[in-house]
């Protein structure tokens, strides 16, 4: 696992070249979508031929996909990989997906768009501090774990309570399915945040050079992606800013600035998750070859 633009995909592909008996499972909430290749930095066809990735291109952009969906899909893929006497190698930056795998799946009510819309309206009217304070009053344990700026999870925690009458914390204690696997956890992180931010900026400009705008135009021309219910795919970093540009809300230069800033903010959130993550083996992404060596050594030592 690691922040965006840290070189996770390159490391995974290199490891696959060295150790054929690993199969890669993508842990990325953006890579699941078809027709969203450039803006998600999805591995290209040549890379996927060398190192196929599970759980890539499994949803249309109009479809929803939850952490619970990922849990079930990843569990199924890991079972199949192990039965083939290979080792599952999970790679990505969607920390909530990793957390779901490690902590287990507990049954939650389905989303309710009206409740979400009402909460978002109230947040715009009174401010997110008040919405977070409401969560503190209802479910202080969850509120303590959810940052004020993590609006999506604040909404979800309140939504769960208003639907079920039970808090997120209470539901976790009622029934919790945990996977039977033992995980070895690695974090691939550059030596400095400035270097990571430089990579992010360079990658965003490279995406524009190879056709990111045209990719989003094709999505923008789909009427089914303009409905209020479609939020997950179009809210992906980069796509949201390009969508605003195509909608005429911002100009091209603003789109670039906002896209880079949003990606940096994503990386910052990912690093915050990782700093709090227990039992991590930290690897320097400035030297991916050495990082790959370290993982290979551990796999051999653990007889994986």
Swiss-Prot record:
Keywords: ATP-binding, Magnesium, Nucleotide-binding, Transferase, tRNA processing. It catalyses: adenosine(37) in tRNA + dimethylallyl diphosphate = N(6)-dimethylallyladenosine(37) in tRNA + diphosphate. Its EC number is 2.5.1.75. The keyword Magnesium applies. It is an enzyme of class 2 (transferase). Residues 28-31 are annotated as: Interaction with substrate tRNA. GO terms for biological process: tRNA modification. The record marks 94, 116 as: Interaction with substrate tRNA. InterPro entries: Dimethylallyltransferase (IPR039657), IPT (IPR018022), P-loop_NTPase (IPR027417). It comes from the Bacteria. Substrate binds at residues 4-9. The keyword Protease does not apply. ATP binds at residues 2-9. GO terms for molecular function: ATP binding; tRNA dimethylallyltransferase activity. Its cofactor is Mg(2+). Monomer. Catalyzes the transfer of a dimethylallyl group onto the adenine at position 37 in tRNAs that read codons beginning with uridine, leading to the formation of N6-(dimethylallyl)adenosine (i(6)A). This is tRNA dimethylallyltransferase. The gene is miaA.
